[in-house]
């Protein structure tokens, strides 16, 4: 576009827009943020706002769309939620003081990952900005990941191998935005979710921002980290030997510098004003839960509706603050593997559990705290509004009370609240003594500062008070002086205060009255004295507002300089709150403290499903036990039982109890001894994944392959009806082979729920497999679900019975029964089973024979002599063909 065709202001706009081509540019003009050209069209469409126009010079009228500045947060939230980035251009000087064109600059770029506005954030969920650097080798991708939440200060780095592991970390974090160094052939810019050009090999559901490669280079990134945190080496951060992690972190910091110009100013204390120094972690520090497992076990949302209600987190989260809620969610998605850390959390829960009075009082104190973690960053970034500062002050003011409350505490976490940083208490007091308790949300209209704080402010206010009083009295004095009883003092926007007199009496007014307006029944006058007072009030009011604003900003800066210390207590409080919530659940739901061991045992006595138990009337849930992990029990349990009997519930409850234990929580069981797991795998139900072009069965097999390839002795594997999605014989064969492989090769602790009753034969063949069944009571005309798990295998599924209960038409039920009888009598599988019964004399116990023949570990190799035994099955299944 030829600049000569544009007014100077529009030239400036176009110039800025060129610098931020991937963001919507919001250009401040007076009380509005205006957008022009395509941005205007886009925003008017997305937000359903009126598209207007503006004269832009010789070019004529151009499209324009505006939002009032005071509604900025609301509209910005909508745009960011849709995955857009916003470049906010503010006026850097008051329009009336500008010589020529008002100076305007882009002060902030808001992108989905760099949001700090309360309206744009979810209270109980982190909002992560991630950065990834990948090195794609011939065999394996090596990657570095950095992620941060600029609303709370969290900052982590990690380096790992394997595309899948990276995707799982992303699935855990659900980053709002992912930064990548641009690669050859790709440009710069932002890709909204679902963009068909999503970066090679990465999931399409995220927002990606492609960045220049330079800040992601090792030397640059390292220098950036060292500089930012005032360090001489990265040794202390633990990432010295992790070049890809460093590169990702450097790219992330650089992005913040560039987009958050006004927020990210060097902090006087050194360090980053918004992010604490990055912490390094490894995937193996934590219990690994893959995406399927998080989904299948419904940790944070239900499978069917994606709802929070009905998830494990719904049962667990009794924390009182949003920061406690966020912490709990993080713990749930990233359970521990370090027994010492688990014990620390358990200790705190136990202390709270054993002291109801401590718990009650702690609960009400926590209730009165605000989200200190986010408030810390609101003050650090200089964006906190008066109400937020008041919330900060009142929360800090509670710290001494908290310290007193935990004075006798025995566990380290609670003890760490005993020492209160006096600077924070001071700050809290100063905020409380400076700010009025319920100030308006805006900064520039006064009403913020208490009397007695500032002498000048008090003087101005007093003067305004006197002048107002004088005006209030004026009606009375002027009535007396003029002898006009109907004289009134009025006010309107157009010309301020005036004296109103009915037209009939207009002749009686004193001569110093100046006529301003004549209405039908009334004449309006002013006097020089009145105008003088009025002007004085107006100037004083402006001065007051200005003074209050200054005092407020000063106080906010003071608070900002303590951000790191606030963040630190906030973190402790968040952890205390999360554990407080877990203690509450433990009390209300009768959870017990599990014993954590280093071996492979998984012993649960009278365990319950935390969510199902909550949704049933009290006492109706039937507890069940389990022993897994040789030598404490079998390694693999084949679980059979009728439809609707409770197999899936049992299987999931074991996984949930293990996860609860490793996140440090108590568990719904009478007693539990649990060896630490490295991973929990699940394969449950059939979910179509049409989006990725995979069939139901293909998804099932993919997930199964993943389990067989990655599970180990330390893993817990939960398989629900493997092989169901294909022809019966294929499915049965696969189920058999998978179970056998898990028991003999992987030796993972496994629960294998199935309707293939043939699998019960594995118990007789393999020493570390046992059969369990969920029993029902069969009456003459119906069955009763007992939901009890017992040793032994079931031989019927009562599927037709369940169909009847579900309301299948009677003729269909009758016909199904006929077909079933025929099938059982004549099918090859039926024949096979019956002939197998004959061919196996009861005296010849195959389990004994198997043990003699197998190798010294008692576990056969797949191709070992045990094959003789395994051949039993194919011959019996396909008797006619062989
Ligand atoms: N231990 C229990 N105590 C009380 N109710 C239970 C218990 N276990 C399961 N139930 C109830 O039974 C219902 C069915 O359980 P579940 O889905 O586990 O059965 P299933 O054996 O897996 O059935 P299917 O073979 O059809 O998949 C649950 O929704 C729950 O309401
Ligand atoms: Mg089931």
Curated annotation (Swiss-Prot):
Pfam families: MutS_I (PF01624), MutS_II (PF05188), MutS_III (PF05192), MutS_IV (PF05190), MutS_V (PF00488). Keywords: ATP-binding, DNA damage, DNA repair, DNA-binding, Nucleotide-binding. InterPro entries: DNA_mismatch_repair_MutS (IPR005748), DNA_mismatch_repair_MutS-lik_N (IPR007695), DNA_mismatch_repair_MutS/MSH (IPR017261), DNA_mismatch_repair_MutS_C (IPR000432), DNA_mismatch_repair_MutS_clamp (IPR007861), DNA_mismatch_repair_MutS_core (IPR007696), DNA_mismatch_repair_MutS_N (IPR016151), DNA_mismatch_repair_MutS_sf (IPR036187). One of its GO terms (molecular function) is damaged DNA binding. The keyword Endoplasmic reticulum does not apply. GO terms for biological process: mismatch repair. HAMAP family: MutS. Belongs to the DNA mismatch repair MutS family. This protein is involved in the repair of mismatches in DNA. It is possible that it carries out the mismatch recognition step. This protein has a weak ATPase activity. This is DNA mismatch repair protein MutS.
């Amino acid at each position: 576009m030829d600049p000569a065709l544009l007014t100077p202001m529009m030239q400036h706009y176009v110039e800025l827009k060129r610098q931020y081509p991937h963001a919507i540019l919001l250009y401040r003009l007076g009380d509005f943020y205006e957008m022009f050209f395509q941005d205007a069209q886009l925003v008017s469409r997305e937000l359903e706002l009126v598209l207007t126009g503006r004269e832009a010079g010789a070019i004529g009228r151009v499209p324009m769309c505006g939002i009032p500045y005071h509604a900025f947060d609301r509209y910005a939230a909508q745009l960011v939620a849709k995955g857009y980035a916003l470049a906010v251009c503010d006026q850097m000087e008051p329009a009336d003081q500008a010589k020529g064109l008002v100076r305007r600059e882009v002060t902030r770029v808001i992108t989905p990952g760099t949001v700090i506005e309360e309206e744009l954030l979810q209270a109980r969920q982190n909002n992560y900005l991630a950065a990834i650097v990948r090195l794609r080798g011939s065999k394996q991708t090596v990657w570095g990941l950095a992620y941060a939440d600029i609303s709370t200060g969290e900052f982590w780095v990690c380096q790992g191998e394997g595309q899948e592991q990276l995707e799982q970390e992303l699935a855990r974090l659900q980053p709002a935005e992912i930064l990548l160094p641009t690669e050859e052939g790709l440009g710069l810019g932002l890709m909204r979710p679902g963009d068909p050009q999503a970066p090679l090999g990465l999931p399409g559901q995220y927002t990606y921002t492609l960045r220049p490669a330079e800040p992601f280079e090792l030397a640059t990134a390292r220098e950036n980290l060292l500089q930012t945190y005032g360090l001489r080496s990265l040794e202390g951060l633990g990432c010295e030997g992790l070049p890809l992690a460093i590169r990702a972190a450097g790219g992330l910091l650089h992005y913040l510098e560039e987009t958050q110009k006004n927020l990210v100013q060097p902090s006087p204390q050194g360090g980053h004003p918004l992010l604490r120094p990055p912490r390094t972690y490894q995937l193996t520090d934590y219990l690994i839960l893959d995406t399927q497992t998080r989904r299948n076990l419904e940790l944070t949302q239900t499978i069917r509706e994606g709802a929070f209600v009905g998830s494990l987190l719904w049962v667990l989260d009794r924390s009182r603050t949003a920061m406690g809620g966020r912490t709990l969610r993080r713990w749930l998605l990233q359970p521990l593997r370090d027994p010492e850390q688990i014990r620390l959390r358990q200790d705190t829960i136990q202390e709270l559990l054993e002291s109801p009075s401590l718990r009650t009082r702690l609960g009400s104190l926590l209730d009165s705290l605000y989200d200190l973690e986010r408030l810390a960053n609101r003050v650090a970034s200089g964006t906190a509004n008066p109400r937020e500062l008041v919330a900060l002050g009142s929360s800090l003011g509670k710290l001494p009370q908290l310290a007193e409350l935990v004075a006798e505490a025995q566990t380290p976490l609670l003890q760490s609240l005993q020492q209160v940083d006096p600077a924070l208490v001071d700050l809290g007091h100063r905020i409380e003594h400076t700010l009025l308790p319920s100030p308006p949300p805006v900064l520039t209209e006064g009403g913020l500062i208490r009397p007695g704080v500032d002498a000048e402010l008090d003087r101005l206010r007093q003067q305004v008070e006197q002048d107002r009083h004088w005006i209030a009295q004026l009606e009375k004095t002027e009535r007396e002086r003029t002898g006009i009883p109907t004289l009134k003092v009025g006010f309107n926007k157009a010309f301020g205060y005036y004296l109103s007199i009915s037209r009939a009496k207009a002749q009686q007014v004193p001569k110093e009255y100046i006529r301003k307006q004549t209405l039908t029944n009334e004449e309006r006058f002013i006097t020089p004295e009145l105008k003088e007072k009025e002007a004085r009030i107006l100037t004083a009011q402006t001065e007051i507002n200005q003074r209050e604003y200054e005092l407020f900003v000063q106080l906010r800066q003071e608070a900002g300089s303590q951000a790191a210390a606030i963040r630190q207590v906030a973190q402790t409080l968040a952890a205390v709150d999360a554990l407080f919530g877990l203690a509450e659940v433990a009390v209300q739901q009768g959870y017990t403290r599990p014993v954590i061991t280093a071996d492979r045992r998984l012993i649960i006595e009278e365990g319950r499903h935390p969510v199902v138990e909550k949704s049933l009337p009290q006492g109706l849930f039937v507890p069940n036990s389990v022993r897994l992990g040789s030598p404490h029990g079998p390694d693999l349990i084949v679980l059979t039982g009728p439809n609707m009997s409770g197999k899936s519930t049992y299987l999931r409850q074991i996984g949930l109890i293990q996860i609860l234990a490793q996140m440090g929580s108590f568990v719904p069981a009478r007693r539990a001894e649990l060896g630490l797991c490295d991973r929990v795998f699940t394969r449950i139900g059939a979910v179509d994944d049409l989006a990725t072009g995979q069939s139901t069965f293909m998804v099932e097999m993919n997930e199964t392959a993943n389990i067989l390839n990655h599970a180990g002795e330390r893993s817990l594997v939960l398989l629900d009806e493997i092989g169901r999605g294909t022809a019966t014989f294929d499915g049965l064969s696969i189920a058999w082979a998978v179970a056998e492989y898990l028991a003999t090769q992987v030796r993972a602790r496994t629960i294998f729920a199935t309707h293939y009753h043939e699998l019960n034969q594995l118990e007789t063949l393999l020493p570390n497999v046992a059969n369990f069944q969920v029993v029902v009571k069969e009456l003459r005309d119906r069955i009763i679900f007992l939901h009890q798990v017992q040793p032994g295998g079931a031989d019927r599924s009562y599927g037709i019975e369940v169909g009847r209960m579900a309301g299948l038409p009677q003729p269909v039920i009758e016909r199904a029964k006929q077909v079933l009888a025929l099938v059982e009598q004549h099918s090859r599988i039926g024949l096979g089973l019956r002939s197998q019964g004959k061919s196996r004399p009861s005296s010849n116990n195959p389990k004994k024979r198997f043990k003699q023949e197998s190798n010294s570990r008692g576990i056969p190799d797949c191709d070992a002599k045990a094959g003789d035994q395994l051949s039993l099955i194919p011959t019996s299944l396909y008797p006619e063909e062989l």
